[in-house]
Amino acid sequence: MPATAINQQPSKALSTILQAGFVAGTLDIAAACTQYYINTGKGPGNVLRYVASGVFGNKAFTGGVPMAAWGLVFHYIIAIGLTIFFFWLFPKVKWLYKNIIVTGLLYGIFAWAVTVLIIVPLSNTPPRAAFDFRKAAIAILILMFCIGIPISVII
C-alpha cells in the first residue's frame, strides 16, 4: 500500500483528511459558483443559499449573507464527510490505490450519486426540475475533477 493518510499517526491522518476535504470542497464550490455565474450571470450567494436550503428550506433563499455562510459551512461538512468515507474505504478495497486518478474519477461519480439519491432527497431543499442529462453530466464532471481526484490524490 502506498504511503497515505491511512498509514499515518491519528493527528497527522486527521490533518490530511481535513486538508483533502477543504481542498476538494473549495474546488467544488468554486466550480459550482463559476458554472452558476456562466449560466445566470449571478453571483455565488444563490448557490450557497441553495445548499443552506437543505437544512433551512425555502427561508434560506431570503436569508441573505448569513444563509450563504451556513451554506458554505454545510458544503464543507459534506466535502469532509465524503473525505472521511474515502479514508475509511481506501484500505478495505485494495484496487483503489492501483490508479488514484481512475479511483478519483469513480469516487466523483459516487459523490454525485450520494448527493442526488441520498443527500438532496433527505433534505429540505425545494424540488428541482425534471432530470436533465446535460446538467447531470456537468455536475458529475465537476465532482470527478473537484472532489474525487483531489481526495484520491491527497489521501
What are these regions (language model features)?
Residues 8-41:
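N-terminal signal-anchor transmembrane alpha helix
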Residues 39, 61, 116-140:
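Interfacial helix-loop-helix junctions of multi-pass membrane proteins
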Residues 37, 41-66:
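Extracytosolic (periplasmic/ER-lumenal) interhelical loops and adjacent juxtamembrane/interface segments
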Residues 92-110:
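Internal alpha-helical transmembrane segments of multi-pass membrane proteins
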Residues 14-19, 68-90, 101-106, ...:
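Hydrophobic alpha-helical transmembrane segments
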